[in-house]
Amino acid sequence: MDKQRVIDLLDQLSPILAGKEETIGKELTEKLQSALLVTKKDVASKDGVALATSLSGFVQTISNASLPGTNLRFTDQEGPVWEELKALTEQTREDGLRGLHLTI
């Protein structure tokens, strides 16, 4: 996985999330920004299954905030950042599981 690309995507996602405060509220915005910062630190310091778990947790947090009945929506311009981060996370998870199966 290209850790630098993931960090770049997280950096791009940060102002996108900050801009959603009016629609999703200050509390949820702060929660998502906090989760983003933790994930960014994890990307820099973790590898393998630990990294995949952290990224998956972050993607799940954002996905939950995007469920029907919530107000988090990405515009056509913002969507590609989110979609690429999800795709990289899925690939990392699959690679981590593949490595786990090889060691068992």
Language-model segments: what does each one mean?
Residues D2-V6, G25, L32, A44, ...:
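Intrinsic-disorder-associated interaction segments
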